[in-house]
Amino acid sequence: MKILSVNAGSSSLKFQLLQMPEEFEIASGLVERIGNKNAEFKIKFNGSSKTQSDLVVLDHSVAVDLVIKGLLENKVIASLDEIQGVGHRVVQGGQLFKESVVIDDDVVIKIASLNDLAPLHNPANIIGINAFRKAISNVIHVAVFDTTFHQTMPEENFLYGTPYEWYTKHGVRKYGFHGTSHQYVSELAHARLGKDHSRIIVAHIGNGASITAVRDGKSIDTSMGLTPLEGFPTGTRSGNVDPAIFQLMQQKEGYSLEKTLNELNKNSGYLGISGVSHDSRDIIAAAEGGNKRAQLALDIQAKRIVDYIASYYVLLGGLDALVFTAGIGENAKEVRKLICDRLGVLGIKLDDNKNNSRGDKEISSDASNVKIWVIPTNEEVMIARDVLRLQNK
């Protein structure tokens, strides 16, 4: 059966059409710059790709129409009847959703009630859900939450040292994100280890990034928190800072709470430290060219990532595998080396020659006590698996 996996962002819409249960990609694509008159639509199928530029795509419903039209006009499908399920990535499930769910009107209302916890993401996810439910109305639609995989964290790992009533009244706690990716990659790593019990750390490093400790297939701690801002510096996010920074910036610069939060979310990390770019490729190139602030941005991130890995090593009582995934984790050998070279005291040792090659591979040296792998993530497959599972229930 054909299942469509959808990831709706605030200004983008990613999709992948999969043949299930074979997990074969039939087509994939992306609509970028939604809300503008210069949007772009890309679709890949049968080994070829097509791009349409300078499109007027004022909202997500137009983007959905583009996707459906692209699938039909390129004869990827003969009719919409071939699509037998749609899976939707939803960033924040809060404490309302402990697992993936079949979407109905009540589920949409509950997802919307969590918008305060993910104001940049959940509203866009809902727009995508509503647009696809209207366009393809006669099939199962499933919400798959970034937070679900982390529901196995114990209280001591997900609660903050804030007044307990904040948690009971407002749900103030660590939720974690990228759960779909962490689950997919850790399941593969567990299978490769061939052990009943495993201790795995997954480093999902992209423009957004997080680290997760996984014991026997279950998340027991993760670096992102109430929102994706917690953790280590990424493309534009600061990661952990002293909350008193909000008062300081109000006193020194007259910044409102919203202004400082925006600076921490959109003008920090690689971009804020280097002054060059949010893109790791630009940062690495600038650092290699002698830009000290670009190198500093890489060093600060690597140091904070190592802090998490070392902490989770202790939490897990040792480590069987360290896995790198996502855009930077899979492709930036320089970032992997910066991290692994700081972990030698834990018996984690990189093979530089293996690290210089691309693709799904082991990059640990023969002397390493821990397996180091690069495993490409595939969140769309995980989403499609849940659609198939719930349809067969």
Swiss-Prot record:
Name of the gene encoding the protein in the UniProt record: ackA
Subunit structure of this chain's protein: Homodimer.
The family this protein is said to belong to: Belongs to the acetokinase family.
Entry's EC annotation: 2.7.2.1
SUPFAM superfamilies, per database record: Actin-like ATPase domain
Protein name from the UniProt record: Acetate kinase
Necessary cofactors: Mg(2+); Mn(2+)
Cofactor binding mode and count: Mg(2+). Can also accept Mn(2+).
Catalytic activity: acetate + ATP = acetyl phosphate + ADP
Organism encoding this protein: Acholeplasma laidlawii (strain PG-8A)
